[in-house]
Each structure stands twice: as structure tokens, then as C-alpha cells.
UniProtKB/Swiss-Prot annotation:
One of its GO terms (molecular function) is RNA binding. The keyword Glycosyltransferase does not apply. Belongs to the rotavirus NSP3 family. This is Non-structural protein 3. Residues 170-234 are annotated as: Interaction with host ZC3H7B. Homodimer. Interacts (via the coiled-coil region) with host ZC3H7B (via LD motif). Interacts with host EIF4G1. Residues 166-237 form a coiled coil.
Amino acid sequence: MLKMESTQQMVSSIINTSFEAAVVAATSTLELMGIQYDYNEVFTRVKSKFDYVMDDSGVKNNLLGKAITIDQALNGKFGSAIRNRNWMIDSKTVAKLDEDVNKLRMTLSSKGIDQKMRVLNACFSVKRIPGKSSSIIKCTRLMKDKLERGEVEVDDSYVDEKMEIDTIDWKSRYDQLEKRFESLKQRVNEKYNAWVQKAKKVNENMYSLQNVISQQQNQIADLQQYCNKLEVDLQGKFSSLVSSVEWYLRSMELPDDVKTDVEQQLNSIDLINPINAIDDIESLIRNLIQDYDRTFLMLKGLLKQCNYEYAYE
């Protein structure tokens, strides 16, 4: 025997279609409001919320359970249907349903949906006419029952009364919003002007700093040029000094080994780096003084051995 699950499939299809309708409604609303959105993000958020509400409220399981009961009855298994019938006519079930209805009413009242609004929503529905701004007000079965029971009255005085929504002074609200907007606009302009002044001051300081940096760079360039010229002059002076000393050395009646030693010391002077050149000249002068001191001591000792005395004049 073929097992029928058409009712379950229909319920699942209705639930899935409801979810797709919720996604389409959300995206179309965002488009009408001119809000940029990511379809995948909207789809994920709506699915998460939809699944949570359907599961937490028990609506999905309730619908699928009823569909399974109908399919079982269609397949010749009436046990579940009989149990559901007995459960529905049980006094405890009726009391529980009545309690749930009362909870829902209190929840709606706490949300600001009073009895008048609940009754009107239950008695009437609005049908839009495509292509027109007007609508058709339809009476529900509850309204029909109230008419049959004589629970509907016509109050002519109610027409002249103003509804609560009509008592709102939209002009004063508009004026208040306009004042708030002007105040906000003034604050924004003040902040913008202050920011502009700060930006101008920063630019002035930046230009002043750039001028100072430019002047310092020019001074540094001049000093660098002067240092380069001084270094070149010192190199020329040291080179001239070495040449002059070499020429003077060759003109003196000194032993060749002494001349060679002094010439080697002169040639070892670093003529490129003035600092090193000064150190080399200092070392050469010390060596000459040391050699002169040794020569003087030798001459002094020789005079003493010869029983001669010496004196400075």
C-alpha cells in the first residue's frame, strides 16, 4: 500500500514559501527605503529569526504534527486522529487553550494593543485595489456573527468626535523639529567654522615651519660649502707644507739615512683628511724634538767627558 505524505509535504512547502516571502518582503522594504544591503546577510538574518520563532513558538511542530495525523488518517490509521479528537474535547485542554488566549491578550495589552484595536482587527480587514489609492474594507466572520447577534450599534455622535490621532498638533511638532534642526545646523556650522579656523592655523604653522626648515637647510648648505672649501684649503696647505719641508730637508747637510727617515714620515702624512694630517704632523714634530733631545744629551755627555763646560748665551 502506498504511503501518503502529501499533507506533510504541503505544510513544509507552505512554511518554506512563508520564509521566502519574508525574505522578499524584507529586501523590497529596504529597497523602497533606499537602504543598501547585502542579500546574503539579509537572507541569513531572516532565516535565523524565522527558524527561531517557528521553533520556539511551537508553530512548526504543531503544523507538522497535524499534517502527520491527517496523512495517517488517509493511510487508514485513525489512532492518532482519535487521540487528537479526544484531546481537543477534553476539559483540561479547553482550560489550557483558554489560559493561553488570556496570556496572549495580556501580552497584547502590555504592548499597547488595547481591546478596541484587537476587536477591530478581528472584525475587519483591508483589501487593496491594484492601481488605485482607495481600499475595500472587508468584514470577517466575527463581524458577521456580531451582526446576527445584534452586537453592532450605530453611534451617530461618534462621527463628530475627533479621534485621538486627530488631536495631534502636527504644526507644532513640525515647528519643534524645525527648531531642533536649525539648532543642530547651527552647532554643526559652529563646529565646522572652528575646524576651519584650526585648519588654517595648522596650515600657517606648517608654512612657517617649512620656511624655518628651508632657512636652516640653506644655512646648512652654506656651512657645508664653507667646510668643503676649508677642507680643500687645508689639504692644499698641508701639501704645500710637506713639499716645503722636503725641499728644505734636501738642502740641509744631513746624513742620507736621516733624510730618508724624515721623508718617510713626511710621506706618511694623510693629506686627504686634515684631522689625520694634524696628528701625523704632531707625531713628526715629537719625533724631531725627541731626536734633538737625544743629540743634546749626547753632546752634553761628550763635553763632560772632555772636561768642558757649556753655557747658554
